């Protein structure tokens, strides 16, 4: 049997592969809004009901509970394994939102509203003002975008006679959805919108609001082609799902008018509608001018009185639902998303959610925005972006470094940048942290490598052009680090300086304000090859390349609600627990890995380490130590509320913090006898630990962390 493809199909497949490889996803939320009817609960325009009693404080805000409701489209041909991967991705996103946002919960199950204009043929004027007189015989229920809402999620239908006070029930109230603050319908389908724009991975909209204007329900549609095995990227699906869900929760142009001013609510006053959320600046650019947003913008740029600019591509006279790309590279809420490891939930976006009035934002959540930090009032304008001296924009088409210095970048532009050029990450081979990549002989690709501007050469003319190259780095303090070139010693690299490396001609530029931020001095291990006893073990490797820290620890989980513990439910619980621990420690969820056997109880061995599928972040240098100090300030427990498992308790089996395994360089003076002694001691310790574990733990099968890849980067033979 032969298979033929039309030129359109071939073009579409090539385009899809190209966009996927670039990890760029376009968002069409603003166009989807125009097709989504919204059902509201009698929202009061100027004054809204008090969100919490006069005497209460923020204690009445509780973690946001988002409940996904899965629906498959008729043309969604994906496997059960792919569906499970999607559920795991959304579970991570909902846990992230639950730890970030809190709401004032309503009692009972969530019941959505019916649209009176759909189910009612006519209404009374008096005395039963605006109450339904006759039901529409053609009424076929409610929809959320293209999704039909189940009747048991909806309120009932009642009709009134002219004068009677009691109505007649035509449709009973549904049971509702328990333990839910926001109901998310999840659809998988290859819709016309998916086919029209191959770069669209998913799109979403809200469709119901409560009396205060807060969205109650929405829908997210995942395009089937991006969920197929050959295209699937878990980190990218998580990124896009978070972006779209933030739209449905309130970051949407059609909801700006519903944002509330609750600054006086703590004194017992009712929240009021904000007079105006958006306005244009002197250049005609729409910006959000709300108090917390302006405060965070001022802290970010180093000036006062600046609003946050919104995307103007396609919306010359309207406010957009995205941040302007020229100002917010790396933000989760730009219209064109960068690769997941270069995109973050930023403080300006969190400030917007604070100013919505419906949410309390967790102040301990780590958020970052490096793009434009301290660049001043005129940063990001089309008239100023031609100045490449700021280190953010560039000119021409040179090979340099992405502004986070995790990747090499090519100086280029796109339709959202309005002629400005930035260093966009290379499509292939530019990740300095990926050891499989290769480059010039002096380069080192490794989890601890970063991109540096350099023109280093060995024995050749030093007049080469400066471009991005990958070298090892190690942090010594805040914005203080060393750099290592292939076959060189560690060299101090003062931030902002140009340095030379022994044995090479040329220079390296040491970036300032983007490496070793938030550094904490490692109190559990040193940067010299010394032996550390106790829970913390220093493993020495005979290699010139240091490896990233690997954390291993064990937890015991208890739940208050009984379940029949199938392997699927256990796996679901494990994914949830890993997400909670990651959020608590402030590390990426993918940093934590575990495994489980069907005959085991709820005790899990967990390993934290960077991998190819989990690239490091700018804070990667402190990720392991964040886990180490997770329970030092109190009892070794984490207790949280789960929508499925009720109350969940996570207990660290050892009373001390998790053990850290850190690899260091082995100096030439460490002789074989010392190595043998260490190996013998390790074997004795392993036997002792095995007996102790068999005696006291109900669950065994703990596994040691895999040794990180220490091999030298692969260098093509013609470059050696």
UniProtKB/Swiss-Prot annotation:
Residues 26-668 are extracellular. Residues 1-25 form the signal peptide. SUPFAM superfamilies: Metalloproteases ('zincins'), catalytic domain (SSF55486). Its EC number is 3.4.24.-. It is a single-pass type I membrane protein. Binds 1 zinc ion per subunit. One of its GO terms (biological process) is establishment of left/right asymmetry. GO terms for molecular function: metal ion binding; metalloendopeptidase activity; peptidase activity. This is Ciliated left-right organizer metallopeptidase. InterPro entries: Peptidase_M8 (IPR001577). It comes from the Eukaryota. Its main location: membrane. Residues 690-720 are cytoplasmic. It holds the Pfam family Peptidase_M8. Belongs to the peptidase M8 family. Keywords: Hydrolase, Membrane, Metal-binding, Metalloprotease, Protease, Signal, Transmembrane, Transmembrane helix, Zinc. The chain crosses the membrane at residues 669-689. Putative metalloprotease playing a role in the process of LR patterning. It comes from Xenopus laevis. PANTHER family: CILIATED LEFT-RIGHT ORGANIZER METALLOPEPTIDASE, LEISHMANOLYSIN-LIKE PEPTIDASE. One of its GO terms (cellular component) is cytoplasm. Its cofactor is Zn(2+). Disruption phenotype: Embryos with CRISPR-induced cirop null present heterotaxy phenotype (heart looping and intestine defects). No other ciliopathy-related phenotypes such as body curvature, kidney cysts or hydrocephalus are observed in cirop mutant embryos. Zn(2+) binds at residues 243, 247, 322. The active site is at 244. It is found in: Membrane. The keyword Metal-binding applies.
